[in-house]
Amino acid sequence: MRPLTPRQTEILELIKRNIADTGMPPTRAEIATRLGFKSANAAEEHLKALAKKGCIEIMPGTSRGIRLTQEDAEVELGLPLIGQVAAGEPILAQEHVEQYFQVDPHMFKPAANFLLRVRGDSMKNIGILEGDLLAVHKMQEAKNGQVVVARVEDDVTVKRFEKKGNVIYLHAENEDYAPIKVDLTCQSLTIEGLAVGVIRNGAWL
């Protein structure tokens, strides 16, 4: 199989994840929406390229006519490493991906969707250290006590989640840092994912 471009890898990963989560492949329109394409036609062109490389089969006449090939089952896509996140952009936007690591997503429970490089020492008391790669399961809701990747206004942070009414507290695991208080009546907060594991700094570089 010929090597895939980063964009093709991203689309193939999206297809696999959608099948794993819902039991069916995404439509062209869903691919376009999730990856920021202007139209479903752009997604179709990438799907044709993946078909030529033997990763998928395209079945005409149905919006979900995408099937993974047996050959592709042997390909390890790896996980995208997210770097700096631009304000207002989806965390998994292609421009945020620094590189891909050959890590099995299913070694984490639940399975990881991406890696985030840890900056700072605010979570050091639970072993999340500067420079570590945090494995993250993409989700939009969290329970009290979970360690999450959250976007507060335009800043992305890793903290322990606590919700009390309309107020959310993001707690550090380091006595030097005060909790971040977010009043949902006047501030915005988005849960980007749940921390599911750590790859120690340098272990995979």
Curated annotation (Swiss-Prot):
It catalyses: Hydrolysis of Ala-|-Gly bond in repressor LexA. Its EC number is 3.4.21.88. Residues 28-48 bind DNA. GO terms for molecular function: DNA binding; serine-type endopeptidase activity. Keywords: Autocatalytic cleavage, DNA damage, DNA repair, DNA replication, DNA-binding, Hydrolase, Repressor, SOS response, Transcription, Transcription regulation. GO terms for biological process: DNA repair; DNA replication; negative regulation of DNA-templated transcription; proteolysis; SOS response. The active site is at S122, K159. The record marks A87, G88 as: Cleavage. It is an enzyme of class 3 (hydrolase). HAMAP family: LexA (MF_00015). Belongs to the peptidase S24 family. Represses a number of genes involved in the response to DNA damage (SOS response), including recA and lexA. In the presence of single-stranded DNA, RecA interacts with LexA causing an autocatalytic cleavage which disrupts the DNA-binding part of LexA, leading to derepression of the SOS regulon and eventually DNA repair. Homodimer. This is LexA repressor. It comes from Shewanella denitrificans (strain OS217 / ATCC BAA-1090 / DSM 15013).
